[in-house]
Swiss-Prot record:
Biased composition (Polar residues): 502-511, 840-850, 1015-1035, 1046-1056, 1094-1111, 1172-1202
Source organism of the structure: Homo sapiens
Name of the molecule in the record: FERM and PDZ domain-containing protein 3
Superkingdom of origin: Eukaryota
GO annotations of cellular component type: cytoskeleton; plasma membrane; secretory granule membrane; tertiary granule membrane
Start and end residues of each FERM domain: 147-461
Bias (Acidic residues) ranges: 649-659
Bias (Basic and acidic residues): 555-564
Residue ranges, compositional bias (Low complexity): 1134-1168, 1732-1751
Organism ancestry: Eukaryota, Metazoa, Chordata, Craniata, Vertebrata
Gene3D superfamilies hit by this protein: 1.20.80.10, 2.30.42.10, Pleckstrin-homology domain (PH domain)/Phosphotyrosine-binding domain (PTB)
Chain intervals for the UniProt region annotation (Disordered): 491-520, 555-574, 622-697, 832-871, 1014-1216, 1309-1346, 1732-1765
InterPro entries: Band_41_domain (IPR019749), FAK1-like_FERM_C (IPR049385), FERM/acyl-CoA-bd_prot_sf (IPR014352), FERM_2 (IPR035963), FERM_central (IPR019748), FERM_domain (IPR000299), FRMPD1/3/4_FERM_C (IPR041779), PDZ (IPR001478)
A Pfam family assignment: PDZ
Amino acid sequence: MQEESANDMECEQLPAEILRQVTVHRDPIYGFGFVAGSERPVVVRSVRPGGPSENKLLAGDQIVAINEEDVSEAPRERLIELIRSAKEFIVLTVLHTHQSPKSAFISAAKKAKLRSNPVKVRFSEQVAVGETDAKMMKKEALLLIPNVLKVFLENGQIKSFTFDGRTTVKDVMLTLQDRLSLRFIEHFALVLEYAGPEQNHKFLLLQDKQPLAYVVQRTHYHGMKCLFRISFFPKDPVELLRRDPAAFEYLYIQSRNDVIRERFGMDPKPEMLLGLAALHIYITVSATRPSQKISLKNVEKEWGLEPFLPPSLLQVIKEKNLRKSLSQQLKAHQTHPSCGTKGSAIQAKLQYLRILNELPTFTGVLFNTVGLDEKQSATTLLVGPRHGISHVIDLKTNLTTVLSEFSKISKIQLFRENQGVARVETSIMDAKPLVLLMEWPEATNFACLIAGYCRLLLDSRKMVFSRPASQPLPPPMIKADYMHSAHRPVTGGHLGKKESSYVGSVGTSPRKSSRCTPPPADSELVSFCYLHMREQRKEQESRTDVNENLIFFEETRPRTKSDPTSKSSGQGYEVVPDDFDAASLDHEPCASRARSYTLDNSLGAEALNFYCDSCKAKLQEQLGPRKGGKPGSSRDNIVDLMSLPPPGSEEEEEEEDETTSLLPAIAAPPPGFRDNSSDEDDPKRRAVQSQEQGRHLRGLLYDEIPVTLIDSVQTRTVRDHAQELDDALVSTLQALEALAASEDGPHPPPPQTAGLIVLATITPESSLDSGHETNSSELTDMSEMMSAMKQHQNTTYFLAQHLNKDSLLARKDLPFRIQSCAAQAVLTAPYSLGRPDPNPSLQPIATGQSPGPPGARRKLPQSEGQVQGERTYSLAVHPALSPQLSEQKNLSLLSPVPEDKGPGHTRAGLEMSLRAATSSLSEEQVSELRDNLPKEVRLSPKLILDPKSSVTPAIISAALQQVVHNKSLVTAGGALGNPPSRGERRLEASMGRPEVSMMSSSASKNLKFKISPSAPETSWNSQHQLGAEVSSSPRAPTGSRADSLHLSQQEDSLPVQNFPPKSYLLRTSRESVGKQATGEVAGKGGPVGGKPTLQKQGTISSQGEKAQLESTPKRSKLEETSLVPRATYPMALQSPSCQSRSHSPSCQPHGHSPSSQSRGQSPSCQPRGQSPLRSQAASRQVSTMPSRKLETTLNGAHSTSEGPAKPKSSRGPFRLRNLFSATFPTRQKKETDERQAQLQKVKQYELEFLEELLKPPSQGELPGTEYLQPPAPGRCSCQLRSSPVQQGPGMSREQRRSCDCKRICRGGRPQATQTPVPSLRGRERDRVLPSQRQPEAGPGVSLSSPINVQRIRSTSLESRECRSDPESGVSCLTTCASGGECLGAPNYRKLMRRYSISELDQGDRASLTSDVYPHPPLGMLPREAKEVEASLPIALGPKSRSLESPTLGDPSYVQVAPETKGPRQMAVFSLPEEVYRKPAELDEDSESSKCCSIRYCFYYRKCDMADDASDGKDELSYSIPMKILPGMKLDEQVVPVVSRTLQVLDAATCSSSSPEASRTQEIDLRVSTFEGSLAKINALRAHAYGLPDGFLAARLDTNELLTVLRQCVASPEARAPKPYVSQISEYKLELALKFKELRASCRRVANVDKSPTHMLAAITGSFQVLSSLIETFVRLVFIVRSEAQRQELLAKVEEVVRNYTFLLRAAEESTARNLNQQQQQQQQQQQQQQQQQQQQQQQQQQQVAAAAGAATEHPPGSPTSATVMSTFTHSLKTLIK
């Protein structure tokens, strides 16, 4: 008999040339029911539908025998005679010959059937898509194009199907059945293939009734394939051969592929694989060369052996033995044992399948249960046709126990037990139900498999898999959810679909959910939300929770905004019940969502975080009137942007419209592209398509096109936010307002939070979107997000999820991208966003409005409304900061504010008061202020409200928020372009006071008191003047501007959202103070003049909020284009910091005295850092920092006026990343408590280590104790000591650690020892007063002192002394500035570089100069350095200023802040302890510290780097003093690189806490390949390190290794089949040896001579060992099968690499210290010769050394190396274990 062709299946044919016997009974009507042709042999032309031959004979069958009589050569007449002679039945032996693909399967009857009942799926191979990729079909993806599903057949074909919302899995299977002429489709199923953790391949069964839209929705279609497989096997292959030869042939091909691709759960024996390979060769050659003798040599020549053998077999068996065995078996097959003839191909295939059938895992599927405890341990179950449900005792010996047969199963139900775990209850007749706990993906597959076997073996209509009625209804759909479910028919799903669809979809029809379809407008909203949320979805994907981890496909699938948890997918498929739909329709027309079940009940609250309240409100508003209308199917609305609007019924068309709106333009296929059956839908679809295209374009703009914020939109959003405080979501406007307000008001979160919210509201959407509608919707989205946050009290999570830091705000292409630092700061707001405003009644006051309904606010002019919105925000934000200030100073300040009803008056009064206070303040007063400040600080941390005082912390907070908000509003809306409107001014004024008070609690106290009297007028004037001054005379008003800048910066930083007003107030107050102090009036420029300056400068602080407000739109645009991206978002969120920062650079200007600079910078930096960080820390830090800033601002104003200030574009104080970092919660969501504790320990370790490194060799080298302690006016002795450099008198590390001040700082404003601070401040102020710059610095120190305390507390590494000057955060601020950059979007960092690039560079240089450079490269003379040390106030000149300011602001800046007090001021390095603490704590601890904190910076840096590598290089994230080694030249380029490296390294440490970072890594690291990784490692290993940049290179290379680590684990190759399993043990052993070797090499590094050459040689050797270790790790990762094991290995190795980075730092610092000591000895000798001059130089050098090489001052035997080594050794030991 003729053998079948090898290519039969390849041509989409059922097996050809297969003989089969068919018994056909004569029918009285149809006879035998087929028409035969006249060919010889006779061919069946057609089969009569409904006749007896249907499903027995096929068109094209050759009749070979009739009743066992051969008629192949008989004449036609004989054939007819035989047929007629058969009376009742006839037995035909027919041969199905190979025919053309088309004619073989479409008979006339079938065509008629198709016409009458067309299938809902059409093949679309001929469809031409624009610019299609020739390889598109072969790519392993679920979708070919948006609504075209690719199905991979086992015969090598790829079929593509267009689908709409009605198309189900069953439709696709029926179409394939027709195409492949399959009889029993019950054996088949569509499955999704993905790489499982333990197995190379896992298949997720799709239920028949599952709509394809859900499948696509719930699947990450980039990483999965849809396969058409036989999933329900026959008990014996012979049965299938008899019943359905085509299915038998398909089973053979599938099994053959499984063997070659090693898809089995267990490894078959090599002998079995050899036998199967021989059969495979025999079958293939027999089919293609029927008459040829089969020899192995011929096979090798023609095909080679690879196509027939699994890869692992080639490695396990020697080639010689393999050939020998194959040859023997081929000979045996060619000689039949019984008759000696050659066996047929059919027999060989049957034998092939029977051999496989003996493997339990071939026909059966293994399921692992979840063990709860020792009593109930995990078990393994086997489900298969021959095993039923069996318990596996020993898989190797096939020892199993049957638990139940399929015939006894009556019902299967799934219940959600807990996250990711389902309880499977299988009801068994006459026995107790079988209750199992499984992970959701396993559980759904388990239930589907059993249900399929019951249908196959028992009753095809039997449904055993059902969802329990008792199961809770899915949570009501939230807007985001709704958006996804309803609007993204194609896209929303994740692989979880398998679980969810299986679980819920069996009994219900997906259409129910479709009844409530939002109108197309909604879809627009949704599209916006979708765009907004898509980033979040991606981040969530990368961030896997328990459920997600379980569902790998889900993990990969793009997350829908509405579907935060893929795990819920288990239920997700189920449709909402009718009653539920009705209820949901009442509340929210679109509330019902088919996917609602995908949300875990436990996750419901969390899910809310993903919904945009504004969008929800908008939807409600739009849908409300239409409630009566015909509901559309929301189910189909869930479409990805990439998905096409599926053709559908009228019911679905409405949804589709919405859906299509979300789809890209490409989504809409041309009219002929779709299914024929859907042609009637084309007209409507076309309309939808046009909308869809628009939406898509909008989405593209949002995602890819930098767009400036739209003023009107932003303004509207802010105003809406404010309004929302009072109103629930009712109308679109109300919803928007409510969202904003709820974000602000409901959660009187720290100002940062409010600022963050505003930013989120404005930036993500408005900036991205090009249309006002979209913007508003986007803003609404943000508002909704905020509302959700409010509801769930999880700001961090909300922000992180909703505004994907990386995705949206930090994206390179996002002009207004915000840095993570800012985001963290915002998120870490002391108060949760959801928290109600402490004193709602005060809000109106702060707002400048009488409390009234939101409507009243709405009525206000835009600017006023904005102001009000900002005010509201300020209230929300300010509470954290203002409590102390407001309580202490704001009371007086605010009380006047209410009195000053004129908006301008309040603010003006504030400014005036500040100015007057500043100018009039005596040193004693300053001291008093400083003294008071600590108290305020203490209060602020707690946000104390004074019931008696009209101004409460809440009011202050509100004021700050409002200010920020106003600024943001102003920034957002150009409407505020004019000087702030009365409302605005009033807001600013009223707010300004609180803000000022908050900003500098101590300073503001006095200032406020004094300001109150004259606040109204002065405030008003100074506002205008300030604005003018800032813009018109950056230099002249520099002092005043700097002052106001500082204030505003702080304010800005605190209430980022309220930024503009707050900044303005601060600036105004500063200006007033500065003007009075300086005698300069800011009036020169005029508010309008100031605006342009602000825009250009990118600094909005001095000019005033209005300038910023006015210029914000422009500026935001500018920023968008350039640095503004950050600024844009910051403008609202960041603008305060930007403004303050810019002003700080421009006003505060680097030119100011060092103190002023540092302070100015601090303010600017701090504001930046603060705003993001302050949101959290603001509450406690704000008062400390603010008060200091106020003083600083006041003094600074003088100094500023003295020296010109360079306007510099300031960086947004907030960076979403920072905010996120600040919002540790996001991290926490990913981390277990244990992990967090470990992180804390690691950070503390690092901190202590760095601290030790930074410790001076001896106290003698340290500045005087007075210098050390007094330096920080608000510092606690512990804090003073905390700075390694200023370790003079002090406390032990333990004492410092336990010091209350730290707690205070963390909790709220640090209560640094106030007494010392006042004295310090007094001194500083005295110094500052003598020279305006100095005064500024002094006040800055004083004001910053509390902040410093915070920072100090937060960073023991940071030199408190230096910081005291810039307490606002000279070093921290600088870092902050850098942190601000960090906070700002990575772009911001780039753009901002926050000063002009030159300035930034200078800043870097300056920081290096002070910290790192023995000689300030900036041209800072030793004298200047000294002056800076002595009193930052000393004017270094504009250049110095800018340098210094930038230094302070520069993220990369290593700040060496000399204490103004000590004659030999020590340079202080800001190394935040916070780094070691959790981000939230850090943020709270110190605004500047946050920025400076290693951890924060790293966080930010890391994000930044992920966003923009070049940006990351620009800044030093790790503020560590570096001593320049001989021959080493550090310039502004190198410093940022080093900084970035440090940040990256530390970021790695924080990566677990930075969802953004991890997500970014996942995205960036997925391209790694095995060979590429090894090549990279080998290239790095070849590096040798020497002077001058060896340490830097080593760090960079170590960072590269970290990248390689993550890339490997994230690489798809790592999850591909692992053939080298046998080598795992070898690699593991090798890895352990490498760990030991590394430990030894690291010890050598610690013990080597501290000379640079020897140290670098030791480091080179240790790095080579580390590279070898990483190489071994990579090799191991690529062969380890378990994802869990890979992650565990990664964690261990990562820990070692991170510790190694600390060792490098310690080595560098130790070496630098050694050199520094030598230099110091020489200097001492020179000092003897020239005591005075050399003393000064030594001070300068010491400062530089301290800042840049503080670590270098420790003796070689310092505990640094020991500490590092102990940590390192400990980690290595752990790893080796």
